[in-house]
Amino acid sequence: MNGLVIIDMNNFAIVYANITFLFYYLLDFTLPFHVCRFLFHSSLENGPQHGQQGAATISRRAHCEKSHPSYYCTQKNMEANRQCYVNGTKT
């Protein structure tokens, strides 16, 4: 009986370790996206009318669009900025 408990606990530990690894593995891929969205999404429509800061925002926005075009290339953004990146290509 003790042997069964030990085996069960080992299996649990292995499954838990795999789930934890998978979580952090996926987080590693998605974290840059969420950071990018958090930093730049609220100022996507800022443009050069804001001077240097606006120009820098456009540059960062373009970087985000290149990295995550499916999220950042919305019709609203295209209308507001007259440019968008689709699969890394400027339209």
UniProtKB/Swiss-Prot annotation:
Q: What is its main location?
A: membrane
Subcellular compartments: Membrane
Give TM regions: 12-34
Key words of the record: Membrane, Transmembrane, Transmembrane helix
GO CC annotations, alphabetized = membrane
Q: How does it sit in the membrane?
A: Single-pass membrane protein
Q: Know the name of this protein?
A: Putative uncharacterized protein YDR250C
Look up and give the organism this protein is from. Answer: Saccharomyces cerevisiae (strain ATCC 204508 / S288c) (Baker's yeast)
